[in-house]
Amino acid sequence: NLRAIPNQDGTNSGVFVVLSLDRGLVIIGGTHYAGEIKKAIFTIMNHILPAKGLLPMHCSANTDGANSALFFGLSGTGKTTLSADPERALVGDDEHGWSDEGVFNFEGGCYAKLINLSKKDEPAIFATTMMRGTILENVVLNADGTPDFTNDSLTQNTRGSYPIESIENRTSNSMAGNPKNVVFLTCDCLLYTSDAADETGR
């Protein structure tokens, strides 16, 4: 378990992500959150793609074929849940690009937050947790080997990583037209809304 030594390495903790754009190098240590890998690559893409006329976005996306929608928000605000709408085709759940032709998914997979996941409220995501190819990250298992999605003893940030093909209702090429709806999710888990969310200043 490689960890930084804060006093020696100039970090705030034992966890570190070191990124060199010149070398195309990322070194990650001291964390059990695999999301740091994808976020490091996304950071590099944010540096490279705008110069090529592409906008990298931390959002989920879906479409009904005619109308595409983007959902922006911090972790845990509902991007993955909202994009897995049974009435709309999933483009992707977390990282996308926007070009003149439309939006497209970078990843080819999903990275869903699983804490308090229920079959009733999120059936498509719940189904992926039982599929071949899914990786459950930091999810505590019951004595019989089944996952306990309510257990946050390791972390609230439990995750499921699964191929986008695990979602039945998806676009065939992880692409969609230019979005007509852009949604900014501003509530936290207690449904408190940020002051910055009110454009009127009230």
Predicted regions and their residues:
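Phosphate-binding P-loop
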Residues: 53-55, 59-66
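Glycine-rich phosphate-binding P-loop
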Residues: 66-89
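Single conserved hydrophobic/aromatic residue that forms the stacking wall/gate
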Residues: 192-201
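Glycine-rich phosphate-binding loop used to anchor ATP phosphates in small-molecule kinases
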Residues: 139-187
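Long, basic/Gly/Ser/Thr-rich N-terminal segments
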Residues: 1-26
